[in-house]
Amino acid sequence: MNTKFSLQYGYTLFLLFFLPQHCIAASEENTDKYIEKYPYVYHLVQKELWDKALEDNSTYFPPTYSQDKFTHATANPDFLLTIGNHFYTQVKGEWRCLRMSVDSLSATGVKTIFEGTAPVGDKEADFEGTDSELFPHILGGIHPSAVLQVHMVSRDSEGRFLSVSDVVNTD
């Protein structure tokens, strides 16, 4: 293959990928506004995996962490059911929702940044509302001491997420 063509093609793809419409990142000012509006960070977790982290008092890492390089979360609780139903309906078992804050995560040495949506593993984040929302990306795992509250998650027999107790429901 022609090296000049290969480099030119690579640069073109790089430039297309980083067009402004493909990049939503939060400035420190925007992050502060987001945290003021949404003071908590929520993460949906398989109960079995969370129970293991609690039992061992160890840091939990989601199954896609090695691929994604961060732990997915949302600050806007209105997205919890959409996220669950988009990414996790095929994952069997009970689920929980962890409520944290940027400060509680920081106290365990974990930084949180607010960015545009990103795929979870191989599943694209192409659900409605993702083009204008910033999502907290937790740059590490979640230690039990960072969690302020654990919420029950209700699902139906098809795996659809119906509610997160004391946070959001489908009604």
Please give the residue ranges for each predicted region:
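Conserved, structured core segments of small domains
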Residues: 28-171
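Bacterial N-terminal signal peptides that target proteins for export
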Residues: 2-11
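Bacterial Sec-dependent signal peptides at the C-terminal "C-region" and cleavage site
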Residues: 20-29
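Bacterial N-terminal signal peptides
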Residues: 11-20
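Compositionally biased, intrinsically disordered low-complexity segments enriched
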Residues: 10, 23-24, 74
